[in-house]
């Protein structure tokens, strides 16, 4: 057997040999890890790998970017850098039963007619984005909050089913792959066997093990954990000029392109026509759930036609054209030993069941939500009852039923408190609402704690380093009583906290100072107004353009805002009618909190104001995302479907049904050249 030391040749021949070995080993890796079809014996694979390692060690300048030797892990990182996604990585809405899915199907059918669905198992892992530039893996990132994730490129390179270079000749300049990292059952069991032998703490379930392994700062540890990856979608795809591309007209076709690129795709993907076939697929996968090599918590159902997906579009956090059809949660019986009442940020008083610990759905559960007084009455549950506990959506434990024949004689009624268990204020229940609330407002310490945590959180003011535990200590030590007090903190006060040295305190003070400059939408969201999430806060800011205008708006004015109904408008008006809330806002502004003014666009700057435009087909000179942004900057609303209210349709190459409908309705159509002239490129 010839070893690496016996290779003879010129420098250029050495380089060529390294390239040959790299390509050959990568082909064998795809055959083994992606196609489940080993092409050579293990001993021969090891010989090739040893040859490559030896040559790269002697000639490191010739190592290829997709060399399989990169998979063993490198130097440990100090932290993961944050990176922005090319387009948001959204979550999916859930269907928990057939009724939910039927409602989803009806919503789609009403908008775009009957559709073929593409179904696949819902892996219980971590969503990631892979970016290949000119075919080579450039970056990998976690989903994070959907807009910003963490750069895990080094760790992803250790996963053997992830190709470092895409296969084939017809590869676009930029390909973003969305998929799931998971730990197969066998790898999970082996990992826990090793931990048990060492006396280390065991991982609770494969998902936790995968999460902990993928986020190791030392990639050598990740490399040892036998993680796997399945691709489930394409993200941004662009040509050499940065124009967006659509690689196939169907989702199934796009998955086939991913397979051709050498990426692993679940073999359980199936096309389903109509409700009956979807339900049959769901039942089949549920039946085989425990036989699969990986854990799943449901199936994902997507509209197969890409143009129909584009017509359906998105809601704030999820696509309208896909849904996660969750499996029934695992259930167990246990005993309700008591009930505590917790107070949340908005004053909601929630009964929390204290349970005899029970192992269900991969975790030990000792608490479960009882939601509200109506739920307690519906269940007819008493302290001392034997109850059936379920992890709803395999995440949130809840009591779903009582076992009446096991009720003990000493069972006690659950009494909802008349006064807040934290501050003693009256507990009120507004007519028409199921939730009872503490009337104490920020006088209530529990509400104050949660309000300040929310104010400092990432999606709100984002004070880096101001986590929940820090806020808890600040309140316990009476250093902070309201959000404005956060901006009065200094190094000497912060060093009074546990595990807060001078350096950490200095960094936190700098983060507090940096957080003073924000945006009006983030500030509104940070205030914690009931029912005002990020999207509503952005709509309020866009509509009124100033805090003063929002403060002065009545319910009639507020319901003119996009997606704001009567209930939300009443919550907003009520919030700004409270003197204490206005005092908090004034104190924040006095502390230096500021944001750039939102200027009213001039009519000249927004000639398309009030018009609805639709994009269809492939735009070669600029991507669809850029075109949408340019049109919106000119005042247009860009919609996903054509209707009689559409003012104009921009038709790129391979325009489909939207163009046909526009022509049928007599709506003006602009080609790409006309669009470029309009936006002034």
From Swiss-Prot:
Which positions are annotated as binding Zn(2+)? Answer: 420, 423, 438, 444
Please state the Enzyme Commission number of this protein. Answer: 6.5.1.2
In what residue span(s) does the BRCT domain sit?
Answer: 603-681
* SMART domains the record matches: BRCT, HhH1, LIGANc
Q: Which GO terms describe its molecular function?
A: DNA binding; DNA ligase (NAD+) activity; metal ion binding
Q: Which residues bind NAD(+)?
A: 42-46, 91-92, 120, 143, 180, 302, 326
Gene3D superfamilies registered for this protein in UniProt? 5' to 3' exonuclease, C-terminal subdomain (1.10.150.20), 6.20.10.30, BRCT domain (3.40.50.10190), DNA ligase/mRNA capping enzyme (3.30.470.30), Helix hairpin bin (1.10.287.610), Nucleic acid-binding proteins (2.40.50.140)
Q: Name one GO biological process term.
A: DNA replication
Q: Which InterPro entries match?
A: BRCT_dom (IPR001357), BRCT_dom_sf (IPR036420), DisA/LigA_HHH (IPR041663), DNA_ligase (IPR001679), DNA_ligase_AS (IPR018239), DNA_ligase_CS (IPR033136), DNAligase_adenylation (IPR013839), DNAligase_N (IPR013840)
Organism domain of life:
Bacteria
What CDD domains does its record include?
BRCT_DNA_ligase_like, LIGANc
Reactions it catalyzes: NAD(+) + (deoxyribonucleotide)n-3'-hydroxyl + 5'-phospho-(deoxyribonucleotide)m = (deoxyribonucleotide)n+m + AMP + beta-nicotinamide D-nucleotide
Q: Identify which residues the record assigns to the active site.
A: 122
One Pfam family hit: DNA_ligase_ZBD
Co-factor(s) = Mg(2+); Mn(2+)
What is one GO cellular-component annotation here?
cytosol
**Alphabetical UniProt keywords:** DNA damage, DNA repair, DNA replication, Ligase, Magnesium, Manganese, Metal-binding, NAD, Zinc
The similarity annotation says: Belongs to the NAD-dependent DNA ligase family. LigA subfamily.
Describe the function of this protein: DNA ligase that catalyzes the formation of phosphodiester linkages between 5'-phosphoryl and 3'-hydroxyl groups in double-stranded DNA using NAD as a coenzyme and as the energy source for the reaction. It is essential for DNA replication and repair of damaged DNA.
- PANTHER family from the xrefs? CHROMOSOME TRANSMISSION FIDELITY FACTOR 18, DNA LIGASE
Q: What is this protein called?
A: DNA ligase
> What's the gene?
ligA
